[in-house]
Amino acid sequence: MMKTLALYGLTLALFFLSGAHSAKITFTNNCPRTIWPGTLTSDQKPQLPNTGFVLASKASLTLGVQAPWKGRFWARTRCTTNSGKFTCETADCSTGQVACNGNGAIPPASLVEINIAANRGMDFYDVSLVDGYNLPVSVATRGGTGDCKATSCRANVNAVCPAELQVKGSDASVLACKSACTAFNQPQYCCTGAFDTARTCPATKYSRIFKQQCPQAYSYAYDDSTSTFTCSGAPDYVITFCP
């Protein structure tokens, strides 16, 4: 019995010394239609137990994420199952299932990116339109210390999306807005090759459209100064689609 207690105490001590804690991430769907959020863990780490799920209008769901953790979240729209294969018209992850199983969203997709620190250290989080836009989204913290400001892209970017960036549905409505990188695959838009630094890859007329609509969100790869947010002390997070 004493040996069991000693081992339990050692395990508990190692747990706290390692800085392990679990952050709660709550997803809320304020959109008028059902969405299918997806999750992707970065850095070749194991995926979360739940990599995709259905979320009805006005519904919420909470996932626990063990720190340290880094990854992204998005929502798929207009999804259907035909002949046993699940597909979505925007932000599909191409698994044929609701679960994304380590696949990311096919652009365009509005993203929430979170880097949860160990030792209750400084987390980083953002809303990113680097891969384009499909839905309004926000992320806010609960608890934590420091700045801990909410960030969002609340605008309907689809309404002002240039024709050359538009993704249209079968009914001719604009479902999503591509990034210039996705649309044209040119290094000056993708910040690659000779354009792979902040100095050589400035904002473009296309990224400025995203920035004008959503000033807090990343509009292209080097849009860090106004788009990255921080919070320390092991906060929880609330991600709201159509805030």
UniProtKB/Swiss-Prot annotation:
The gene is TL1. SUPFAM superfamilies: Osmotin, thaumatin-like protein. SMART domains: THN. Keywords: Antimicrobial, Apoplast, Disulfide bond, Fungicide, Secreted, Signal. This is Thaumatin-like protein 1. Its main location: secreted. Residues 1-22 form the signal peptide. InterPro entries: Osmotin/thaumatin-like_sf, Thaumatin, Thaumatin_CS. The keyword Hydrolase does not apply. The keyword Secreted applies. PANTHER family: OS03G0233200 PROTEIN (PTHR31048). Disulfide bonds join C31-C242, C79-C88, C93-C100, C148-C231, C153-C214, C161-C177, C181-C190, C191-C201. Belongs to the thaumatin family. The lineage of its organism: Eukaryota, Viridiplantae, Streptophyta, Embryophyta, Tracheophyta. It is found in: Secreted, Extracellular space, Apoplast. GO terms for biological process: defense response to fungus; killing of cells of another organism. GO terms for cellular component: apoplast. Possesses antifungal activity.
